[in-house]
Regions:
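Sec-dependent N-terminal signal peptides
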Residues: 4-13
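Thiol-based oxidoreductase modules, predominantly thioredoxin-like and allied folds used
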Residues: 75-92, 108-119
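Short, internal strand/loop/helix patches
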Residues: 23, 27, 95-145
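N-terminal "domain-start" segment that seeds a small globular fold
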Residues: 17-39, 124
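Amphipathic alpha-helical repeat scaffolds
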Residues: 30, 50-54
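Conserved helix-turn-beta segment immediately C-terminal to the redox Cys motif
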Residues: 44-45, 54, 59-81, 102-105
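Thiol-/selenol-based redox modules, centered on thioredoxin-like
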Residues: 124-127, 131-184
């Protein structure tokens, strides 16, 4: 009977682990309007960044593109997620955002359609990312544009970097390199 109890307990524990949410449980629309399951990027190291075209941090697009180019062949992807939550700094349509990013910053990493990253209309992905109970060390409300979430190949958040952390900073590049070193 004791053996049966431990087997049952182990199976229940495995069910709880299997049911744990990851970013792969969410879908976004691409900037072109196509449904994009984040599971498309399963097995890669992913950097999710809420972006804006009229922000003091907008020049980070150049650094993000350079970071993407440097590591994309090693299993790294950046996902740009436009949001208009801070000072109305992303007022354009998805087409205007796409044109701006490609013409001015030559962005080639995946860009998603504009969403809300805070407030009553927060998109489910950002509700998940900012949930302190799910992510005690990386959760909490988004403070500004260009907040970055580093996601491991298993879909779990492994780091968060605020707007002031430049894409070419040692802090961010070291975290990306460490995550890439752990790819199977």
């Amino acid at each position: 009977m004791k053996k049966f109890f431990f087997v049952l307990l182990a199976l229940l524990g495995m069910t709880v682990i299997a049911a744990e949410k990851t970013v792969y449980d969410f879908n976004l629309n691409s900037i072109d309007g196509q449904s994009t399951p984040l599971s498309t990027f399963r097995g890669k190291v992913m950097l999710l960044v809420n972006v804006a075209s009229r922000c003091g941090y907008t020049p980070q697009y150049s650094g993000l593109e350079a970071l993407y180019e440097k590591y994309k062949d090693r299993g790294f992807v950046i996902v740009g997620i436009p949001a208009n939550n801070f000072g109305a700094q992303e007022p354009g349509t998805n087409q205007e955002i796409k044109t701006f990013c490609t013409a001015k910053y030559h962005v080639t990493f995946p860009m998603m359609a504009k969403v809300s990253v805070k407030g009553s209309d927060i998109t489910p992905l950002y509700a998940f990312l900012t949930d302190r109970s799910a992510h005690p060390s990386t959760g909490g409300e988004i403070g500004w544009n260009f907040t970055k979430f580093l996601v491991g190949p298993d879909g779990r958040v492994i780091g968060r970097f605020d707007s002031a952390v430049e894409p070419d900073s040692k802090q961010l590049t070291s975290a990306v390199e460490k995550a890439l070193a752990n790819l199977k």
